[in-house]
From Swiss-Prot:
Pfam family, one: PapZ_C
InterPro entries with a match to the protein in the record: P-loop_NTPase, RapZ-like, RapZ-like_N, RapZ_C
Homology family: Belongs to the RapZ-like family.
GO molecular function: ATP binding; GTP binding
Binding-site residues for GTP, renumbered to this chain: 81-84
Keyword Iron: no
UniProt-recorded name of the protein: Nucleotide-binding protein Arth_2083
Binding-site residues for ATP, renumbered to this chain: 30-37
Domain of life: Bacteria
């Protein structure tokens, strides 16, 4: 799918532009319970015009109307709920039509693991839309089967399993609050292997080869964000060389992502508990990657404070 670019705005004196103004179009979809409404609210807070629960067959018509308006909406987000085979066929057709007509757009797919989705539905005391009298898990399984092709083709897949409402809003802000699109957004995430691999990781770096500060009494209470721990980790034999070589190795991958219009990727750096080594290495890796042009780097620590 083509990379979205915000079009030029209408003249301030109210004159109609000579050529149509092209809006940045974002299609928001995903699993029920994964946070579409929260994402819509966050986008609206940052200047997006948001249309929720639009029937998929109306997507092309809305995009055409907006792009040809005398004073265009520069950032349009359409939240599409696909909960039946018929609606899924409609959105596939609508996206193909948009692509064929040259409309630039991106698709954001929100996902979460099954256990989290079940808990959210139970906490909200509401049934899954595809449950049909069965279990919530049955509805989730039906929806996953229905949406897997859409998920595979999405420009951005955002896993919200570890997010509360505020964390999801922050993630949406980091992705979409800037005036213009960024060629590639990297999230460097530290984590602890004992808590499981991050499901949205594109790359996994194993930092367990580094001596563990946990076994140094004066360092154990601290984290990889503290200078003493960071120095201990980064000064260990081979660590700085490893980070430098990893950055060089990943450079052609980042270039390929840009060519393929991939906008978001996660590099997960793991150690045993996600407290010392992975945190220090993630910070150093973020600093190195931030030097690359057309790359925006954010750093998160999934399991810091979990112990």
């Amino acid at each position: 799918m083509a990379e979205s670019t915000a079009g030029s705005e209408a003249e301030q004196d109210g004159m109609t532009p000579v050529r149509p103004v092209e809006a940045e179009l974002l299609v928001v979809t995903g699993m029920s319970g994964a946070g579409r409404s929260t994402a819509a609210d966050a986008l609206e807070d940052h200047g997006w015009y948001v249309v929720e629960n639009l029937p998929p067959q109306m997507l092309g018509t809305l995009a055409e109307l907006v792009s040809h308006a005398p004073q265009s909406i520069p950032k349009l987000a359409v939240v599409v709920d696909v909960r039946s085979t018929a609606l899924f066929a409609d959105i596939r057709a609508a996206l193909k039509t948009l692509e064929a007509s040259g409309v630039t757009f991106r698709v954001l797919f929100l996902d979460a693991n099954d256990d989290v989705l079940v808990r959210r539905f139970e906490q909200g005391r509401r049934p899954h839309p595809l449950q049909e009298g069965g279990r919530i898990l049955d509805g989730i399984a039906s929806e996953r089967d229905l949406l897997h092709e859409l998920r595979d083709s999405a420009d951005i897949v955002l896993d919200t399993s570890e997010f509360n409402v505020h964390a999801l809003a922050t993630a949406i802000t980091e992705l979409f609050s800037e005036t213009g699109p960024v060629a590639l957004r990297l999230n460097v995430m530290s984590f602890g292997f004992k808590y499981g691999l991050p499901v949205d990781a594109n790359f996994v770096v194993d930092a367990r080869f580094i001596p563990n500060p946990h076994w140094v009494p004066q360092l154990r209470p601290h984290t990889g964000l503290d200078k003493d721990v960071s120095d201990y980790v980064l000064e260990a034999e081979g660590v700085k060389s490893f980070v430098d070589r990893y950055v060089l190795a990943i450079e052609p991958v980042l270039d390929g992502y840009r060519r393929e219009n991939k906008h978001y990727a996660t590099i997960a750096v793991g150690c045993t508990g996600g407290k010392h080594r992975s945190v220090a290495v993630a910070m150093e890796l973020s600093k190195k990657l931030a030097q690359y042009p057309r790359v925006t780097v954010t750093t998160t620590h999934r399991d810091l404070g979990r112990e």
